[in-house]
Amino acid sequence: MMKSYLLGIDIGTSACKVAVFDKEGRVLAAANGDYPVYYPQEGWAEQNPEEWWSAVCRATKETVQKAGIAPAEIAGVGIDGQSWSAIALDKEGKVLTNTPIWMDTRAQDICERLNKEIGEDKIFEVAGNSLQPSYTTAKIIWYKENLPEVYEKIDKILQSNSFIAFKLTGAITQDMSQGYGLHCFDMKKGCWDEEMCRRLGIPMEFLPEICECDHIVGTVTAKAAAECGLAEGTPVVAGGLDAACGTLGAGVIHPGETQEQGGQAGGMSICIDEYKADPRLILGYHVIPGKWLLQGGTTGGGGVMRWFEREFADYERMMKQQTGASSLNQLNEIAEKINPGSDGVVFLPYMSGERSPIWNPYAKGVFYGLDFAKTKGHMVRACMEGVALSLRHNLEVAEAAGANAEVLRAMGGSANSLLWTQIKSDITGKPIVVPASDTATTLGAALLAGVGVGLYKDYDEAVSITVKETRRHEPNPENKEVYDKTYETYLELYKSLAHMMTK
């Protein structure tokens, strides 16, 4: 039987997505599987990895059935996943507790203590990243200090994609691109640093062996095949970080090429071919061997608009029932009627603390500039602009660190909004290309499998065959001039309020 199809699995924050692609990158079928985020306390955000697996099984069965292909026709499986999990497994492979996810900041005190005890510079020298509560490192220490009954049973710590690979194959692995979540990972050498493990208090035996993202870690077991509907023996590659796989799926594989992320969280990833680190940013390995990604990330990406729609769009939801027009599209329409700069309304998108470049887990979302003349449209447009202003902030820091961001390649749900994409182009002053596929992240995971099993000879071939452009946005110079002033206000606003955004 001809094996010419690839399956990509994306472990997102609110749902998984599974898609089957042909060799040309066309989607035969796709399905989602939802799961909750739990917020037990302020600053906490956690998920049950077994709920990820259940959702993956449901979505995989549905996808393969809708694709109308035999499971045995799938040549390989690739997995991408959200960052900075701390999935604690015992010796039998049982999940011991819910994992804190990327937006969880419960370990802030631990980070402050470790930075003082070890030294911020010494940690940064090894890891290429500052120690923040969002990362995996402090979450492991948090287990030790707050859940000793869990900690004493830990055999291995996994990331989101490596957990799904484990469920599919039984193999325990750690891919290169997710290594950056642990500050005992040497970002220059691409291996665990035993001395930093000791100083951080992380046992080396907790850490799986490092492998490349396109490495075949195993094949689908009989048990997994029965649960998810794939064929026993199907090769599975290690996969990688969702942002890095999305970067590949958007066609970003050479230095200077940049991916703009518009999913639940926002941000950017610039491809570089040499080590460049800045404590205000995030440095990780690309899913492509020999490349790094200099990244910036805001907690408030597309999630900002979903929050606004949920809390303030009762009228739009009512109209949706009458007209069928989605409430988000209606919000886009009212925002489009507002002038660039939202007539002075500025929004700080720090809805769950903030990551780069300010790294403040206590930062809060702020609307500034409201008066009786302002409307819902002003607030909607300000939300879009606030996320774009954060993107510009990250890009400017990255370029100051020596990276070169030329054209941005947009991915994620917000790329479907012509208005929002144009706002990002105007604010950053960068052209933005939108790939034809709206499944760049899942496609990137599938391409890892395609290269891993030999369906493509290399990543240049894979991208040239599968990644197409659907539209291009050029920055409007007049709007850019307005936004330059808005950006100054944005920076000054946080600077003025930062002393209030503390524990």
Predicted regions and their residues:
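Active-site core segments that coordinate phosphate-bearing ligands/cofactors
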Residues: 7-8, 20, 49, 108, ...
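A short local loop/turn or secondary-structure capping micro-motif enriched for an aromatic residue
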Residues: 36-39, 105-107, 302-303
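Short small-residue beta-strand/loop micro-motif enriched in glycine and branched aliphatics
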Residues: 41-42, 95-98, 175, 293-294, ...
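N-terminal glycine/serine-rich phosphate-binding loop of ATP-dependent small-molecule kinases
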Residues: 1-97, 125, 153, 225-226, ...
